[in-house]
Regions:
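Ser/Thr/Gly/Pro-rich, low-complexity flexible regions
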Residues: 126-280
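Acidic/polar, low-complexity intrinsically disordered N-terminal segments immediately downstream
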Residues: 4-142
Length: 280
């Protein structure tokens, strides 16, 4: 039988004399999801004794469709607490989940270590699909500066499915100067911007929808009105754990809309009030 380091009642035993207690960081089952174009990922190993250098053997127990290329050993320099195990995935396809199971062995692996010496990793490259043009209406910058919050900005939306959510993304409409409107009135940028307000770069809004609700990941807007870069995101999960005071957004699949209620999002400017975040 083996012990479960995640169990509440689990207390590690004493390591054998001189054993460094090398193990994986994290749970037995781990999920790794990466964006297209990324062909590797890192797993982290840790150890209890760090005075001397150490090496551990890595055995592949399961390599689904032979997607994974793994090193046979991982080494720690003297004094190092953690080390990286880099897994290459050169032939993985988008939108498919592959399983990798690894085991550690050697004189510095112990059944009494603080974590697992075997893990199972479910790996996937996210597959994005275009779902067409949508319209973003902003109530953060608008309320902060008193400009019209009902102005629609046309954005090209992509969608993917992760292990825990449905995810949407689109380029920041604030990182552009509006030069035209489409047939329904959507601007192709932020109509209150001038050229000098735009900060060159790539800025992407990412919204995760789960059973709890919709959450906007922290994002830089790509816009500066003289007080530093604008940024924003969901208050809950980033600035607060009080979901009653700072609710998540509401996803209406039938209507094809996501609505963020009052106090669900924050806005910040890097050089204003030390970059303080203000809920709206």
């Amino acid at each position: 039988t083996s012990c479960d380091p995640d169990a509440e009642s689990y207390t590690p035993g004493e390591l054998e004399d001189g054993n460094q207690g090398i193990c994986f960081v994290g749970n037995y089952t781990q999920t790794v999801e990466v964006e297209p174009g990324i062909t590797s990922f890192d797993l982290t190993l840790t150890r209890s004794l760090t005075d001397a250098a150490g090496t551990v053997d890595v055995t592949v127990i399961n390599n689904e469709e032979n997607i994974f290329v793994c090193p046979s050993t991982v080494s720690f320099a003297a004094g190092e607490k953690t080390a990286k195990l880099t897994v290459e995935t050169p032939s993985a396809a988008e939108g498919i989940t592959y399983n990798l199971q690894l085991a550690l062995s050697g004189n510095d692996v112990s059944n009494y270590s603080s974590g697992y010496h075997e893990i199972s990793v479910n790996f996937a490259i996210l597959k994005w699909e275009s779902i067409g043009t949508g319209y973003y209406l902003d109530g953060t910058v608008a309320n902060f500066f008193g400009v019209d919050p009902s102005v629609p900005m046309a954005v090209e939306i992509e969608k993917t499915t992760t292990a825990t959510s449905t995810r949407f993304r689109f380029d920041s409409p604030f990182a552009k100067v509006a030069t035209a409107q489409d047939e329904v009135g959507g601007f192709n940028g932020y109509p209150f911007n001038e050229e000098a307000d735009v900060v060159p770069g790539e800025y992407t809004f990412v919204i995760d929808v789960t059973k709890e609700g919709a959450s906007l990941k922290p994002v830089q807007y790509g816009m500066d009105w003289g007080y530093g870069m604008f940024s924003g995101g969901s208050v809950y999960g980033n600035l607060s754990t009080n979901i009653n005071s700072y609710p998540l957004g509401v996803y209406n699949e039938k209507a094809g809309s996501i609505t963020f209620p009052a106090n669900s999002l924050y806005v910040s400017m890097a050089d204003y009030q030390d970059g303080g975040a203000y809920p709206f």
